[in-house]
Amino acid sequence: MQDIPREQSLIEYPSAFPIKVMGAHVPGFLEAIVEIALRFDPAFAPDSVEQRPSKAGNYLGLTITVTATSRDQLDALYRELSGHPMVKIVL
């Protein structure tokens, strides 16, 4: 992947970067997402995860805020989250 010159990037690194992850409200979903976040940001605070169940309770929306250190890190994190079988969507 071609690097975007620093002056053209919309994100300044390092920075706190929120990511929304949605999936079925099933046991282990939160823990799986926290485990992934910790692999990409060892300083990630699991107790900082914001949780929002859907109205019917079938889905769970999570907001994780990681310390973004590079575009490559964010791209890899998005790929891993998106590829997880419990995840429906990543924003």
From Swiss-Prot:
Coiled coil: none annotated. InterPro entries: UPF0250_YbeD-like, YbeD-like_sf. Pfam families: DUF493. Belongs to the UPF0250 family. This is UPF0250 protein Lcho_4239. It comes from Leptothrix cholodnii (strain ATCC 51168 / LMG 8142 / SP-6).
